[in-house]
Amino acid sequence: MPNTKPRIVITMGDPTGVGPEIIAATLAEPEVRQCCRFLVVGDSAAMARGITVAGAALRVERTDTLNWEESKEGVLPLWEISSLTEADMQYGCPTVASGDAMYRAICEAARLCLEGNADAMATAPISKEALNRAGHRYPGHTELLAELAGAERVVMMLAGFRLRVTLVTIHEALADVPRLVTFERVLETIRITHRDLHRYFRRNPRIAVLALNPHCGEGGMFGDEEARIIAPAVAAARQEGIDAIGPLSADTLFHFAVQGAYDAVVCMYHDQGLIPLKLLHFDDGVNVTLGLPIIRTSVDHGTAYDLAGTGRASAESMKAAILMAAEMARVKGSGGGTP
């Protein structure tokens, strides 16, 4: 019988951070090895060092063919895209070479997915500074992947088993948020959230849409974005058959969301969504890029230079990202989620 386990390609992230070691720790776990077939895109020296730091019973095996065989016991299959020197891999000291290696790993993984040679990609954390020093001017994974995939609008979703949040604005100064919360952005965020939750998680997702201001603006006393922008966007989404409700006050909504009343919460700005998400899922939260033609999940943390090489970095978010990518690929392959 053909092997139907999802094919997950994993990028090594910043070789001077915790990426290689949390990947090694994750891929040594039977639960992960049994749920999917996997291939790491990265540097063999960096991954071998990561295996040692993690104390994983694995060895790197380089490959240049995509046969997607069942992963051999004790083997970490690697698609090599760089040959970093020891100087390029000093912990906490990203270089131009390491920044270029991160970029090439992301591009190669995206290419494999876009060409149908992998079912999903899961990414380890990168250094945005090193990426830019290497001449690749992107704020992060999301913007680079959107360009590679030709996606006009993407949405960041942070997810755990108790809560999913999506963001209308992401890395913006709080003072700029009211100007950036537009009817078009709110409606498009609701649409993409609905479409991809339908595609990868549930057939009929129920979506809560948060207010921007305290108490939904209190009838205009604390701002009018709710009446002028958010409520019309929710009404337009409902006209399209989307089960969206809002605007709702953020100070009470999350109490009901974590009890399962909603499948996702659309938030107006970064901290409005990430504070409750990280309160619940600090170790095992997953970053998912919605709006792409491919599945991309990632850890919900950074390079953690202070922990790199110590063996103390938690691999729970990396594990959750790979497991979620595999589950999303399975649901997509079966034609959609279940009600």
From Swiss-Prot:
Q: Which cysteines are joined by disulfide bonds?
A: none
Q: Where does a divalent metal cation bind?
A: 171, 215, 270
The reactions it catalyses are: 4-(phosphooxy)-L-threonine + NAD(+) = 3-amino-2-oxopropyl phosphate + CO2 + NADH
As recorded in UniProt, its EC number(s) are: 1.1.1.262
Matches recorded under InterPro entries: PdxA, PdxA_fam
Pathway participation? Cofactor biosynthesis; pyridoxine 5'-phosphate biosynthesis; pyridoxine 5'-phosphate from D-erythrose 4-phosphate: step 4/5
Mention one GO molecular function. Answer: NAD binding
Cofactor(s) of this protein: Zn(2+); Mg(2+); Co(2+)
Q: Which domain of life is it from?
A: Bacteria
Q: One GO term of the cellular component aspect?
A: cytoplasm
The entry's keywords = Cobalt, Cytoplasm, Magnesium, Metal-binding, NAD, NADP, Oxidoreductase, Pyridoxine biosynthesis, Zinc
Gene3D superfamilies reported for this sequence: Isopropylmalate Dehydrogenase
Pfam families documented for this protein: PdxA (PF04166)
What does the UniProt function comment say about this protein?
Catalyzes the NAD(P)-dependent oxidation of 4-(phosphooxy)-L-threonine (HTP) into 2-amino-3-oxo-4-(phosphooxy)butyric acid which spontaneously decarboxylates to form 3-amino-2-oxopropyl phosphate (AHAP).
What does the miscellaneous comment read? The active site is located at the dimer interface.
The UniProt entry, under PANTHER family, shows: 4-HYDROXYTHREONINE-4-PHOSPHATE DEHYDROGENASE, D-THREONATE 4-PHOSPHATE DEHYDROGENASE
Query: Entry's NCBIfam families?
Result: pdxA (TIGR00557)
Q: What is this protein called?
A: 4-hydroxythreonine-4-phosphate dehydrogenase
Name the gene that codes for it: pdxA
